[in-house]
A protein has these predicted regions:
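Short, charged amphipathic alpha-helical "coupling" segments at sensory-output junctions
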Residues: 1-13
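PAS/PAC or PAS-like capping segment
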Residues: 71, 128-130
């Protein structure tokens, strides 16, 4: 089992990779009952939406579903389960709104489900298309 320090080092390494992505990067636990909690959010993800890390965590209670516009939940969640993941990967991006500090931003998102140590996660990118 990995320690918190090992996980932290892994996320720091991930941040170095995420800095090379033109959009924002996020990773969520595959836990729909708890709103798909964020395991990781890149600095660029926060920058696109205008949030500081501390206010983002407080505002959304670390839940992906709290960030998605209520009318867009179907689009924002369509790839977030094992049954849809393979189909989603073949069909391309999803377009929906995420709540930014100054209002909703339209984003294009590409994501896939991965397993890590037996747990399911959704990893994805967002690009601002507002």
């Amino acid at each position: 089992m990995e320690t918190d320090e090992t996980i932290k080092k892994g996320f720091l390494r991930l941040e170095r990779y995420a800095q090379n992505i033109p959009g924002g990067f996020h990773c969520c636990a595959e836990d729909p009952e708890n709103g798909y909690p964020f395991a990781y959010v890149s600095d660029r993800f926060l920058e696109i939406l205008g949030w500081e890390r501390a206010e983002f965590a407080a505002r959304f209670d670390n839940r992906y579903t709290a960030l998605v516009h209520p009318d867009d939940l179907a689009a924002g969640l369509r790839y977030r389960n094992a049954e849809n993941s393979a189909t989603y990967a073949k069909n391309g991006d999803s377009i929906f709104r995420l709540l930014g500090k100054n209002g909703y931003r339209w984003v294009s998102s590409a994501a896939n489900r991965v397993e890590w140590h037996g747990d399911g996660y959704i990893v994805g990118t967002i690009t601002d298309i507002t």
